[in-house]
Amino acid sequence: MTESITWPFPWPQSAIAQYTAYRVNTPPQIDGRLDEACWQQAPRSPRFADLITGQPAIHDTRAAVLWDDDYLYVGYWVEEPFVEATLTERDALIYEDNDVELFVAGQDAYYELEINAFGTIYEVFFIWEEAFDRAGYAQQPAFDRSQPGVRPFDGVGFQPHPRGRRIGYWHWDFPGLHSAVHVDGTINNNQDRDRGWTVELALPWHGFRALAAPDGRALPPRPGDVWRMDFSRFNQYKAAPPAQDSGGWAWSPHGVWDSHVPELFIQVCFSTESV
């Protein structure tokens, strides 16, 4: 049988990106600058491409991943000639600004983080509804479905997903998250030309317990373990026609206007090679 028959998702399985995450010998300072040697030596992603078509984006965006026994580290380099942001309240709808996004998937749940050039964070924890009881989430007070900020979610452009509906926890905050943004220019001042902004994240492994529990994955990962992650950028502007710019760019495209497809997330392998 061909992949088009057996693979029910809108981007070829063979085209999903893979990445090797190196260990850090000295943890980076989370200041958003990405100027430590470990970030300079870490393999960077290719230039992000359009989320739907895979065509080159008008501005350069790249990401890299590092790790140690305590944290998962993620860095973004964002070319932006006119850096802009408006939202300052935590869990505001950051995708209505220009942002970068991180998704991390477990077997039965996934985590979403968005951040703008002000460093404002938006987070959601999603659980597949069909796994809610089976995976043990129903027994955890933190995932009581009667709480404020809990509601069903059916995805965005890829519907219906083969696994069905998710339960979203919009009040959930990643335990111990550290984040920082550095703007190389002047934010919200379009009288000059900026170079862009960089984002630095440190997510402690203990914060992934709810994600890791259903399949018993090791925290921190064992060398050779593979996790699914997604890295993207969304803009309130688009390249002029004839460019086919959806306004969403990703390390590994999805073929549809929807980041919420864990099966299309990048395969990140944790290496013992260090930087």
Where are these regions (language model features)?
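Structural preference for beta-rich elements and adjacent junctions enriched in aromatics
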Residues: M1-V275
